[in-house]
Amino acid sequence: DISYDNCNADANVMEQIISDFQADGVDLMVGVATPVAMRMQASTEGTDTPVVFSAVSDPVGAGLVESLEAPGANLTGTSDYLDTASIMKLIEAVNPDTKKIGLLYDIGQDSSTAAIEAAKAYMDENGIEYVERTGTTTDEVQLAADALVADGVDAVFTPTDNTIMT
């Protein structure tokens, strides 16, 4: 039997789903996105229940695994890590006159950290100005995006964080 559910980014629902899975004695848990994977990891610590994660941008930085080569514990999965330098090069290839790039992300999302830092490093090394705007809700993200347009950015870079993706 396969049991599945979707918390729709609601932390309370996520907790209930994980508790239900544990009460049902599932043989394996699969978590999609960093917050779910982290909570599943914590809830299965000290048990034999393995956790497989996906759509986690920085599993090492999030503390899910010790390394990508040897994850450790009873946990493994896949990463959707962004090759930020390639994305920046693509932006420049599409618009060689790019002078200013907007960074749009949720500052509270662990999945944003590595990609945003890599983007800043690339732009610093290549003399590209950047403007950061953040939002923690859909409404704030819309306002931040509008602000980037008003700031006159030539392009916008968004990492794979859950708030921006919704």
Regions found by a protein language model. Give the residues of each.
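An alpha-beta-alpha
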Residues: 76-126
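Structural motif
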Residues: 2-23, 134-149
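Beta-alpha junction/loop-to-helix N-cap segments that form part of ligand/metal-binding clefts
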Residues: 6-66, 161-166
